[in-house]
């Protein structure tokens, strides 16, 4: 049996990448001799990790209340525990983060130290970045400040929408986790310190690119960028983009780039609008 530094592994989060992480944790448990469990904090109807837990008999808990979740983690303080935070919005309190027995790693959907905080794919698009990526990093008291374990890069293409970029990043995150997980278990993972600029911006969940609004006389390129940054398909991460026409508030329900002229930055849009 390979030498493992942990007695227990906890996976917390939801969605595609969490399911991939849990699958890897489950498949390697007998090799490394740890116990494991899955925690669902934010309940989602199509949760791949929960489905896997139910299908394979993996122990899992639903702890939606933050105080209950914190108490649950406090009960683990006497046990050598690895917590894997994947697509998880719970902020671990200082008592948990600073415990000698607890190690936490987290998936972030940007190339840290860039774009720390929430909804990084949207900000990658809105800020016009040519590329972004994913980061697995150790968790410290500061938001997204811990040492980097592994990163993978992907392009932010001219027509990509937020939900499409997220899909790319989920795939990369699963690949990266498989590459680094065993080294994390054995405490052999390469650690790269982040260079944190003083006063760097941390994006909050309530912040919306462009405040979710545009003017019809804005450049088509800027309008298209905003629309793509807010577009999570059927997931209502942000409210629909808004504009005004003849003094009337309008919501953009659907949009399409119909023409992009060859040597000019020019777009013609087909916008389906709902007048409030």
PLM feature spans:
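One-carbon transfer enzymes
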Residues: 1-238, 243, 248-250, 254-275
């Amino acid at each position: 049996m390979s030498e493992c530094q942990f007695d227990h592994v906890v996976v917390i989060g939801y969605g595609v990448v969490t399911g991939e992480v849990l699958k890897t944790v489950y498949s390697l448990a007998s090799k490394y001799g740890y116990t494991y469990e899955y925690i669902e904090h934010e309940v989602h109807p199509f949760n791949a990790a929960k489905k896997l837990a139910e299908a394979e008999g993996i122990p899992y808990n639903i702890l939606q209340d933050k105080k209950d979740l914190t108490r649950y983690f406090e009960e683990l303080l006497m046990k050598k525990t690895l917590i894997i935070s994947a697509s998880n919005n719970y902020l671990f309190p200082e008592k948990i983060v600073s415990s000698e027995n607890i190690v936490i790693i987290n998936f972030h959907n940007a190339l840290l130290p860039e774009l720390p905080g929430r909804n990084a794919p949207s900000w990658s698009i809105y800020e016009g970045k040519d590329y972004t990526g994913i980061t697995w990093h150790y968790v410290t008291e500061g938001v997204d400040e811990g040492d980097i374990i592994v990163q993978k890069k992907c392009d932010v293409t001219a027509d990509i929408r937020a939900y499409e970029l997220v899909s790319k990043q989920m795939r990369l995150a699963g690949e990266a986790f498989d590459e680094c997980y065993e080294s994390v278990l054995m405490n052999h993972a390469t650690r790269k310190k982040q260079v944190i600029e003083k006063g760097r911006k941390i994006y909050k969940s309530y912040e919306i690119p462009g405040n979710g609004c545009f003017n019809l006389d804005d450049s088509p390129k800027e309008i298209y960028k905003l629309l793509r940054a807010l577009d999570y398909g059927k997931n209502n991460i942000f409210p629909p983009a808004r504009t005004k026409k003849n003094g009337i508030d309008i919501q953009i329900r659907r949009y399409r780039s119909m023409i992009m002229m060859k040597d000019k930055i020019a777009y013609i849009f087909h916008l389906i609008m709902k007048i409030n």
